[in-house]
Amino acid sequence: MKLHTAVHTAIVAAAAFAALAGCSMMPASLGGWTALVDGGKGLENFDRIGNSNWRVEEGAIVADRNPDKTPSYLVTRTSYTNFVIKAEFWASADANSGIFSRCKEPKNVGDETCYEANIYDQRPDPSYGTGAIVKVAKVDPMPKAGGKWNTYEITMNGPHLQVVLNGQKTVDIQDSKLSAGPVALQHGTGTIKFRKVEIRPL
């Protein structure tokens, strides 16, 4: 009986150790980062607004069709104040997309209610196109993201807002219009793929 108990205790202890070791290796918790999108995983982390055909395809979360012709969003269920977002995305040349932050109205996402780091190479006014924060911080010249994989790093720390696209700083300003809220991923037109999106609170 004692031997059985000892063996059982050892098995439970080993299982607990293995579980802890496994958790410590999870990318979602490494260095304070939380994975919102990790390859084809992550749709469950968002609420959907609109009718774009968000789906998992070839290791990414993808949308390329919107029957309503109005922007659609994946909106986090968590609100964030100060943070860094890192994202890997692919956009077609005609894509209209973006990463929205500090959305004060989670059910009414837009460039008036959020900070939008734009992904829109063909925007009629390119000063607020790809790399800009729409209606807040312009870019000149506008970088292009279409037809390739790109990286975005978006930092919001109090009024300090910074955007880095493919290693190039495109925005570095002070603005206090919005202070906290969810993060949202947009599909408007064209094809957008998110392979990685992670966030770390500051």
Which residues are covered by each model-predicted region?
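Bacterial N-terminal signal peptides
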Residues: 10-21
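Carbohydrate-interacting regions of secretory-pathway proteins
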Residues: 23-202
